[in-house]
C-alpha cells in the first residue's frame, strides 16, 4: 500500500521534475497488476520508490502490514523481487549459475557452501525453463544469452517467494520468441507461488490479457485503475482514448 507518495528530482533547479505526485494505491494479496503509461509517466520511479533506490519526499510505503518507508534497499530486497529491462542487470556475470542462485537463495547473506540438497533444488527450479541450464550449473552466467539470463533472473527473484514481485518491462529487450517464453514462465511462477506482482509493459494487449488488474499512469498519478470483469470488456482502443 502507498499513501500520498511524492518524489521530485532536482528540486529548485531548471531540471526540476515531479515524478510521483501524492500517489496512493492499495494492492490485495495475489493481485497481478499490469502498468501502462507514456515514457516519463512515473512507472519506473514508482518501482524504485518501492524498492528503496531512493527515499520519497513524503508519504508512506507499507508492505504486508509493515511500514518500510525509511528502510534501506538491502533490507527491502529480502521481501521484494525486482526484474529490470536489461537482462544483464540481475545477475553477476563472473559467477556461475550455481553461485548466482546460491546468492539469491541466501537473500542478501554471503555465499556459503552449497549443499547437495540445494544443488538439486536449483536444478529443479531451472528444469521447467527447458533451456538446459540445469546441466550448465558451473558455467559463468556471462556466457548465457539475454533470454537465458532473464529467465535465470526470474527464477532467482522467486527462489524465496517475495512479498512483492516488480517486473520493469522485463521482456522488452528480448526477441519475440524468447519474450513469449519468459512471459509464460512469469505467469506460471506467479500462479504457482500465488505472488503479488506489478508489471510495467508498453504492450497494451498484454496489459489487458495478463493478471487481474491494470493501472494507467500519467505525470506521477494513477489516472485509471481497472480490474476483473470491467477490465475484461476493454479493448486497446479504449485504453488509447483515455
What label would you give each PLM region?
Residues 59-66, 126, 224-226:
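Conserved ABC transporter NBD signature motif
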Residues 8-22, 72:
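A short, flexible loop at the N-terminus of ABC-type nucleotide-binding domains that lies
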Residues 55, 67-81, 111-115, 231-237:
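ABC ATPase NBD coupling module
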Residues 157-158:
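ABC ATPase C-loop
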